[in-house]
Amino acid sequence: MKSEDYSYARMAPDIHEERQYRCEECDQLFESKTELSDHQKYPCVTPHSAFSLVENSFPPSLNDDSDLTEMQHTHECKECDQVFPDMQSLEKHLLSHTEEREYKCDQCPKAFNWKSNLIRHQMSHDTGKHYECENCSKQVFTDPSNLQRHIRSQHVGARAHACSDCGKTFATSSGLKQHKHIHSSVKPFVCEVCHKSYTQFSNLCRHKRMHADCRTQIKCKDCGQMFSTTSSLNKHRRFCEGKNHFAAGGLFGQGISLPGTPAMDKASMISMNHANAGLADYFGASRHTAGLTFPTAPGFPFSFPGLFPSSLYHRPPFIPPASPVKGLPGVEQSSKSQSPHVNQPQVLPATQDILKALSKHPSVDENKALEFITESNLNQRPHEKISDHSESSDLDDVSTPSGSDLETTSGSDLESDIESDKDKLKENGKLYKDKMSPLQSLAALNSKREYNNHSVFSPCLEEQTAVTGAVNDSIKAIASIAEKYFGSTGLVGLPDKKGTTLPYPSMFPLPFFPAFSQSMYTFPDRDVRPVPLKIEPESPKETKKVQKGKTESPFDLTTKRKEEKASPNVPSKSGAPTSSNHDQPLDLSMGSRSRAATTKQTEPRKNHIFNEKKDMDPELPKTSEHCLQHARPAPFFMDPIYRVEKRKPMDPLEILKEKYLRPSPGFLFHPQFPMPDQRTWMSAIENMAEKLESFNALKPEANNLIQSVPSMFNFRASSSALPENLLRKGKERYTCRYCGKIFPRSANLTRHLRTHTGEQPYRCKYCDRSFSISSNLQRHVRNIHNKEKPFKCHLCDRCFGQQTNLDRHLKKHENGNLSGTAASSPHSEIEGTGPILDEKEDSYFNEIRNFIGNSSHNKQSPLNSDERINGSHDKIMLAGQNSDILDDDEDEAILDEDDEESDIAVKVMKEPNTSVMLEKCSVDEYEEGGKSEVNSKVSPSRYDDEDDDDDEEEDFKKSLSALDHIRHFTDSLKMRKMDDGQFNDAELSAFTASHLTDDLKHPLYRKSKSQAYAMMLSLSDQESLHPTTHTSSSMWHNLARAAAESTALHSVSHV
């Protein structure tokens, strides 16, 4: 519509060239076909008036001068003197003059709004740059590219550029120029990895796509993950934007606190930094500041750490920091003032009075004091909020778990926490009395309250059912994998409770597995259970009874440790660092470095909060069992692969399921963020598989275990056994519907489908042979019919059709396959056995020639022997050369390594040719050798003339005994007369095989040739003229002789 309202001067610049139409009579140029037709209505010598067009277009009633003049002035443009038939057309035209035209032509009064239009218009004034179309001379172009585009689109077609070498056509000259690189020997595009060169850049790109090792690797600057393309890197960077991604600061800006998000100081970070040093080195450390994390990952398989690339899904700590709850002011102050390297006893100000009273009266009921502290903690909830990010330290690679709903904590959660605390105190109340002083007990419970409150949320039904059946089937396998892979990467050889070394290395020290109450995991049963508000004391005996009577909880390590003490023979995997006072309750503020340290280094850090008080009470009874001070829901890392520490070797599968099957992590995922798609978690699984693959190189003894694991991931499987979407990464579009094979391009699939359908659309015009690929047809015509062999070998003057075949031929010269008499071997070029076998064969033929030449001294035998052996040798050499030529010609037919049809065709061609050639060489050799030998041996004159050589000839004749008995089976008694030299022509006539039937004649004749060949081998063994070569060729002789003897036995049994 715009083109109708505005002239071309008002339009945006056109990418196509402005077409011009020339008048054949006056050579005047016109911008449109209509202007040219209007011009041709009148003679070119008398230029017509613009009003004549209007006059011609109006009816005759307007022919009077007054009306015509009025009409002319009414419909004439005053700016450009154009005349229009009606007022409406004139008004439309006048719109083009409303804006100022900046660009005016210096050769004509035309002006343009766009500079590009002015430049294109000025080219029309230059008569030297006019390009006319040969087919339609009326069209003139100012740019030769526009003329070529016009010819392709209007006259010739889409593929006007033909290759002079192969006849292939192309749509553009650039395509033809690029194609001509194929016919040259220059290969400028080289792979940087394997140094393979190509004539075209597209072939190099395809090579890199097909070979994963040669792909260009682009490294992510944030996490170090490698990618082959920039597009895949850009997609990855959406999920990996730096260390603050998925954190509160990363999602909502630096320094902005989420509602209810507590700050984490160094002390809190120390308490939750339990990352094993060896494990961190293996999975890669992602150093992030503290803050809430919202990983958008499902419950399985993302509960496995290491599935995600570093910084892709930031892993929360094994044991979380001060839980996402508004803690006591005293707790915040103490954590602020505490240094990670200084051990100071901290006393909570909120409990000063109680602690003083307890210090004065140690006999006060400690459980009541604990209850009082609990109630006071519940009533003191500060509302201040602190910054999300703590100071930078060497422990800043820990991120906190998500899902803290601080403002909407219900009373049932608090009651459940109280209930769990009661259960813990019932089970371990006596242990607290024996273990610590009242002051320590109060401080421990206060810290415990800080962790427990508001940290457990009931998951929804979907999250509870997120773990699939495949998880249950893989629990045992995952436990084995974790034990095998990570057993030596943690604290190796940690002593157990009794001070002895563990039977197998432990992956984590004891504090990695806090004591969990069963009520923490039975979320549906929480609301129906009573909520106790009083904590009743219980005797140690009752506690022990309860512990023995309870079924072992998969997360309650307290009962586990109690059981371990009762039965020390059971292997323990708790692996707690022991010392002279290892029974002291562990403080979970210990960092990973101190946990990986020795026993002496661990002791002061382990109880740095209570160490002074402990020194003040040296007479406290010590027990070997205790419970950890923080009961909380299943953390992010409490999954089967890390819970192998509790595994017994003989546990049945159902018990393992109860132990290692992680409940649905309801608190892990924030409700505001959706679950990831399949591509995200498949990428995570792939990352885990790659890490396990690389880790296996350090532990090769794990191969047998992993290969037998029936895991759903099949970690140790080959690359072909992995899912295709992990290997192809988006190239599943071109899949064969017959065999399921996947191709990176549609052209490859089309070519492959012809192998199933048998379609061969390309037919040779000379021999009517059909091909499924056009390149095979071109190669066939070039090599077979045209005999084009421009590439010549400078060593043997052989010619080849392509440079690649010449290069292959030159390599044979370098390896020595074509040097000396190596071509004399009937198998040298066909089987490609190498130069060593050629030397053996060459020595074998030399021995036969030398033996015959030295053993034959009469007038006939030297001539016959030389002619026989040399003749057969020449024929063998000729056959070997022909096989070499044929092999090279066939090699020329194998140019494209991706050409499936040509590979199959060459295999089919090579096999019959090889067998036929071997048979032909054997037949020629046996005919030349066998016939002449028999004829020369049975000649009576030979034995009558010379008696000196009787001994040698007798041996020679004995070697023919098997042949003679087969060839002349009915006259075997007469054959023995050869020893006495009594032969005549009548007896010789009886030696013919005319009396044999045709069924026996052919197989016996063929077997006789094999026996003659075996005879020559035996002769070469009897008199070796080259000791150096005889030893090297002994194996070759034995093999050939054994084959000949087996055929002789077979032929005798057949007769």
From Swiss-Prot:
Localization per record: Nucleus; Nucleus speckle
UniProt KW keywords: Developmental protein, DNA-binding, Metal-binding, Nucleus, Repeat, Repressor, Transcription, Transcription regulation, Zinc, Zinc-finger
Region (Disordered) residue spans: 324-345, 372-423, 531-621, 813-837, 922-957
One BP annotation, GO: pronephros development
Zinc finger (C2H2-type): 21-48, 75-97, 103-125, 131-155, 161-183, 189-211, 218-240, 734-756, 762-785, 791-813
Sequence ranges of Polar residues compositional bias: 332-345, 399-413, 569-583, 591-601, 816-827
Superkingdom of source: Eukaryota
Ranges annotated as biased composition (Basic and acidic residues): 381-392, 531-566, 602-621
Comp. bias regions, Acidic residues: 944-954
Pfam family, one: zf-C2H2
Molecular function as annotated in GO: DNA-binding transcription activator activity, RNA polymerase II-specific; RNA polymerase II cis-regulatory region sequence-specific DNA binding; zinc ion binding
Induction: By retinoic acid (RA) signaling. Repressed by wt1 and by notch signaling.
Gene Ontology, cellular component aspect: nuclear speck; nucleus
Tissue spec. comment: Expressed dynamically during embryonic development; in the developing pronephros, specific areas of the brain (forebrain, midbrain and hindbrain), and in the majority of the visceral arch, and head mesenchyme derived from neural crest cells. Within the pronephros, expressed in the ventroposterior region of the pronephros anlagen from stage 20 (and is absent from the splanchnic layer that forms the glomus), then expression becomes restricted to the distal tubule and duct by the tadpole stage. In adults, expressed in various tissues including kidney, lung, testis, spleen and stomach.
SUPFAM superfamilies, alphabetized: beta-beta-alpha zinc fingers
Residue span of motif CTBP-binding motif 2: 585-589
Annotated motif CTBP-binding motif 1, positions: 554-558
Main location: nucleus
Coiled-coil residues: none
Motif position, Nuclear localization signal: 422-435
PANTHER family xref list: PR DOMAIN ZINC FINGER PROTEIN, ZINC FINGER PROTEIN 154-LIKE
Self-association and partners: Homooligomer. Interacts with ctbp.
Domain notes per entry: The CTBP-binding motifs and the N-terminal group of zinc fingers are required for repressor activity in the pronephros.
Function: Transcriptional repressor during pronephros development. Plays a role in regionalization of the pronephros; may promote formation of the distal tubule and duct over formation of the glomus and proximal tubule.
The protein's name: MDS1 and EVI1 complex locus protein EVI1-A
Phylogenetic lineage: Eukaryota, Metazoa, Chordata, Craniata, Vertebrata
